[in-house]
């Protein structure tokens, strides 16, 4: 069995992911659900060869040393894929996330119009959050593409691995891959401040040093995009502050209250008629929100977001209501993800 055939089948069926696991048939995820491909199970030796065929020597060495590895894999004329290879009890496994060759625009994504206002700023931290598979990378790529078409600046991305490939339009774009073009997010961010960027995208805010450097970059006149695996704006603020030791928390609250521009927490919903669409909680850093961050009153954020629709804010439930009203999402699907399930009875 050839990996290119499996990946072509994945793309042809509009799947978001291909899952390979020794001892089982390949499976694909379509509109959020896993489906088996109607082929025989792949045994351990064949699976190992299949997964290894997608790696270069450096990636194979990492896989053998660390027992898992992340990398990108390109099939010319088909798509790019973000790959995580790992070991499991039956042998080798791998997850291939499809990254389309064409970057979707904010219009393609039916993104709220406030997204353009959020990113049209001279400086500040913009966080796009949500669980794995919620479309964070796709949303960020659309935001970066919008800036690339409309701003004459320098965009620098730091990713692990590089997902969407951006061609320079109005902007100069440089994309750096961790372990290939730089040793770590930290090293790349430290260096970034000397590379004259206007916009910096940090693939993931994984640790205290990366968060610290991202906040500093946002404070010193850069637009900084970052992602976290948090499900709401309030949890995002808590997560950012909680990575710091106790004695630094007050200072970080102050820094974050000054530099934050917005938090977009998104989740993917099954669309009526097939496909998926994102629902968003959107928190804009208004003076009231900045005060709540500074004074450690995160619990009051939800009501501030609820009443902030006039400036483009939206709770998840408000976003779900709008998707239901527009006929994009069915009520039972909205109820499944809603905070107040009774509202979608």
Model-predicted segments: where are they?
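Short, flexible helix-loop junctions that flank or precede catalytic/ligand sites
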Residues: 1-345
């Amino acid at each position: 069995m050839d990996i290119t055939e499996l990946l072509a089948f994945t793309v042809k069926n509009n799947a978001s992911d291909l899952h390979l696991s020794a001892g089982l048939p390949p499976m694909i995820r379509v509109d959020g659900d896993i489906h088996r491909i109607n082929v025989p199970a792949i045994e351990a030796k064949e699976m190992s060869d299949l997964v290894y065929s997608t790696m270069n020597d450096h990636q194979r060495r990492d896989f053998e040393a660390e027992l898992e590895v992340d990398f990108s894999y390109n099939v010319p004329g088909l798509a790019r894929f973000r790959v995580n290879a790992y070991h499991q009890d039956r042998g080798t496994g791998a997850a291939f996330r499809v990254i389309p060759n064409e970057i979707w625009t904010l219009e393609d994504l039916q993104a709220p119009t406030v997204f353009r206002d959020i990113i049209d700023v001279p400086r500040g931290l913009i966080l796009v959050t949500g669980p794995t598979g919620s479309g964070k990378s796709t949303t960020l790529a659309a935001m970066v593409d919008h800036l690339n078409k409309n701003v004459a600046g320098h965009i620098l991305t730091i990713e692990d691995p590089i997902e969407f490939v951006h061609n320079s339009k109005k902007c100069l774009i440089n994309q750096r891959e961790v372990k290939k073009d730089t040793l770590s997010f930290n090293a790349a961010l430290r260096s970034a401040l000397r590379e004259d960027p206007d916009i910096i995208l940090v693939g993931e805010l994984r640790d205290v040093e990366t968060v610290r450097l991202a906040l500093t970059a946002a404070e010193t006149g850069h637009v900084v995009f970052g992602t976290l695996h948090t499900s709401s704006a309030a949890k995002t603020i808590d997560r950012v502050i909680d990575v710091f030791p106790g004695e630094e928390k007050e200072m970080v609250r102050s820094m974050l209250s000054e530099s934050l521009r917005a938090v977009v927490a998104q989740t993917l919903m099954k669309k009526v008629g097939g496909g998926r669409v994102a629902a968003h909680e959107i928190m804009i850093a208004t003076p009231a929100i900045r005060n709540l961050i500074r004074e450690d009153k995160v619990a009051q954020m939800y009501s501030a977001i609820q009443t902030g629709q006039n400036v483009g804010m939206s709770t998840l439930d408000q976003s779900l209501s709008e998707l239901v009203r527009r006929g994009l999402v069915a009520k039972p699907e909205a109820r499944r993800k809603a905070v107040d399930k009774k509202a979608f009875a």
